[in-house]
C-alpha cells in the first residue's frame, strides 16, 4: 500500500497559501489531493448551511461530532458554552447549521479540524491550510507521522506585513473573506515563532517568500538543508535557528 501524504500549508493571513497550493498542483509538483481550507468551508456553510462529510469518503455521526467539539481546545479556550454544539446537526454524513445561527470562523474551524481527523483515520492523502498561530496546529504534523504518513510543510510568507494587509483589502473588494488588520498583525509573530518547530516535525519542508513571485528561501529534503543567499529580514531569526539546529548537510541555493 502506498504511504499516505499530509501537506501543511501554513503562514500569516493573506500570504498566498491557496495561491501557492494551486500553482504547485497546476505544475504537477504535487498530486491532486484533498485540500482542507477553513475559509472555503466557512463560505460553504454561509451559503448552503451544509457541509458534506460524505463527499470526502469519511463516516461520521452527530454524537461523534458533538463529542469532538466539546473536547477540543478551541471550545475550552474560546467558547465554553455547552449549548454551542446544538447549533449543528449531522445526518447521513451531512452536517447542517441551524438557520438562526450566524456562521463564523469557529464553526468552520471545528468542521475543518474534525474533517482532518477523519481523513487521518481513513488514511487518505490530503493538504490542510492554516495560519498556524497556535501550537495546536503542530499536532497535525505529529499525528500524521505517528500514524504513518509522509509529512510536508509549505510555509508561505511575505517580507512585509503591509503586503498582507493590502492583500486582505483586495480580497475583500473581490468578495472574499475579511480579516482585521489587528488580527493579521497579532497572529504573524506567533506564526513565525512556531516555524522552527513545524520545520523540524516535517519530513520535507519548504519556506517560500511570496512577496512577489514565489521564491524558495529554505528547503529540507532527503536529510539535506538548502538555503538561499538572500534571507528576508522578517524571518532571519527563525531561519537562522533552523540552520543552527540542523544536524545534516547544508547547501546553498542561488536565486
PLM regions and their residue ranges:
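Walker A/P-loop
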Residues: 18
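Phosphate-binding P-loop
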Residues: 1-4, 118-120
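A glycine- and Lys/Arg-enriched "phosphate-lid" helix/loop adjacent to the NTP-binding pocket
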Residues: 146-194
Amino acid at each position: 500500500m502506498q504511504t499516505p501524504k499530509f501537506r501543511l500549508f501554513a503562514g500569516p493571513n493573506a500570504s498566498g497559501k491557496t495561491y501557492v497550493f494551486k500553482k504547485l498542483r497546476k505544475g504537477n509538483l504535487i498530486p491532486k489531493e484533498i485540500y482542507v481550507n477553513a475559509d472555503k468551508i466557512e463560505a460553504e456553510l454561509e451559503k448552503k448551511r451544509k457541509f458534506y462529510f460524505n463527499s470526502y469518503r469519511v463516516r461520521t455521526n452527530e454524537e461523534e461530532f458533538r463529542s469532538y467539539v466539546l473536547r477540543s481546545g478551541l471550545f475550552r479556550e474560546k467558547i465554553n458554552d455547552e449549548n454551542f454544539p446544538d447549533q449543528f446537526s449531522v445526518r447521513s454524513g451531512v452536517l447542517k447549521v441551524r438557520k438562526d445561527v450566524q456562521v463564523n470562523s469557529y464553526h468552520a474551524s471545528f468542521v475543518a479540524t474534525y474533517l482532518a481527523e477523519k481523513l487521518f483515520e481513513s488514511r487518505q492523502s490530503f493538504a490542510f491550510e492554516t495560519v498556524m498561530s497556535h501550537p495546536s496546529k503542530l499536532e497535525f504534523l505529529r499525528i500524521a507521522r505517528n500514524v504513518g504518513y509522509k509529512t510536508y510543510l509549505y510555509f508561505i510568507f511575505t517580507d512585509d506585513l503591509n503586503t498582507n494587509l493590502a492583500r486582505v483589502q483586495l480580497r475583500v473588494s473581490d468578495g472574499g473573506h475579511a480579516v482585521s488588520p489587528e488580527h493579521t498583525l497579532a497572529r504573524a509573530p506567533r506564526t513565525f515563532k512556531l516555524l522552527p518547530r513545524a520545520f523540524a516535525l516535517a519530513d520535507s519542508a519548504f519556506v517560500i517568500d511570496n512577496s512577489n513571485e514565489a521564491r524558495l528561501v529554505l528547503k529540507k529534503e532527503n536529510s539535506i538543508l538548502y538555503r538561499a543567499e538572500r534571507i528576508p529580514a522578517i524571518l532571519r531569526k527563525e531561519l537562522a535557528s533552523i540552520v543552527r539546529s540542523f544536524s545534516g548537510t547544508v547547501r546553498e541555493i542561488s536565486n
